[in-house]
Amino acid sequence: MMAAGTALGLALWLLLPPVGVGGAGPPPIQDGEFTFLLPAGRKQCFYQSAPANASLETEYQVIGGAGLDVDFSLESPQGVLLVSESRKADGVHTVEPTEAGDYKLCFDNSFSTISEKLVFFELIFDSLQDEEEVEGWAEAVEPEEILEVKMEDIKESIETMRIRLERSIQVLTLLRAFEARDRNLQEGNLERVNFWSAVNVAVLLLVAVLQVCTLKRFFQDKRPVPM
C-alpha cells in the first residue's frame, strides 16, 4: 500500500505475515489495517492493488479528533467514483467483483480548519485464488482411497473454519477501533470537565476575594480623628 504524498504524524501499519508461494506468479494480496493522523485542512489518499474477479471490503472509522467525522471517497482503477461520503464517522463498503489495478481511497479533512483526525481503516480481500488452490489439492488425491470421509466434506469444513476465523479477527479489530474511539471521547470529556471545573474554582475564589475587599471598605472609618 502506498500513501499519496508524505506520511503524516502517527502511522501504524499492521499486515498479516506473508505467505510463501512455491510456484511462479505474484504472491496473494494480504488483508491490512492502517491508522494515520489526518491534519486539519488536508486530504490523504492511498492506493491498493487488487486482483481481478475478487472481493474488496473497506471499513473505516474516525477514532480521534473533534466531531469524529471525515469525507471519504473510493475510485476504481479506471478512475470511476464508486463511493463518496461526506462527514461520516465510519463506513463499510464492498467492491465485487474487483478490477485488476490500483484502487484509490481518499480521506478528506479540508472542512476542518483546526482539528486533526485520527483515522483507522481496514482492507479485506476475498480472492478466488484460494478456492482454486483447494481444488488443486483435492484433485491430487484419488477419491477411491482408504479414507471413508469424502474430500468434499473435509474441504467444506476447512473452508468454513477459515472463514469464521478470518471474520473473528475482523470483528476483534473493529471492536478495538471502537474501544479506541470511545477512550478518546472519554479522555476529551475528562479534559473539558477538568478545565471548566478549574475555571469555576478560579471564578469563585476571585468573587470571594472581591467580596471580602468590598466588606472591608464598608467598615473602614476614613473620617479624621479630632485632636
Swiss-Prot record:
It comes from the Eukaryota. Residues 24-194 are extracellular. One of its GO terms (cellular component) is Golgi apparatus. It is found in: Cell membrane; Endoplasmic reticulum membrane; Golgi apparatus, cis-Golgi network membrane; Endoplasmic reticulum-Golgi intermediate compartment membrane. One of its GO terms (biological process) is Golgi organization. A motif (COPI vesicle coat-binding) lies at residues 218-227. Residues 216-227 are cytoplasmic. Residues 43-125 form the GOLD domain. It is a single-pass type I membrane protein. Residues 145-170 form a coiled coil. A motif (COPII vesicle coat-binding) lies at residues 218-219. The chain crosses the membrane at residues 195-215. Keywords: Cell membrane, Coiled coil, Endoplasmic reticulum, Golgi apparatus, Membrane, Protein transport, Signal, Transmembrane, Transmembrane helix, Transport. Its main location: membrane. Belongs to the EMP24/GP25L family. Potential role in vesicular protein trafficking, mainly in the early secretory pathway. May act as a cargo receptor at the lumenal side for incorporation of secretory cargo molecules into transport vesicles and may be involved in vesicle coat formation at the cytoplasmic side. Plays a positive role in IL-33-mediated IL-8 and IL-6 production by interacting with interleukin-33 receptor IL1RL1. Plays also a role in the modulation of innate immune signaling through the cGAS-STING pathway by interacting with RNF26. Homodimer in endoplasmic reticulum, endoplasmic reticulum-Golgi intermediate compartment and cis-Golgi network. Interacts with IL1RL1. Interacts with RNF26; this interaction is important to modulate innate immune signaling through the cGAS-STING pathway. This is Transmembrane emp24 domain-containing protein 1.
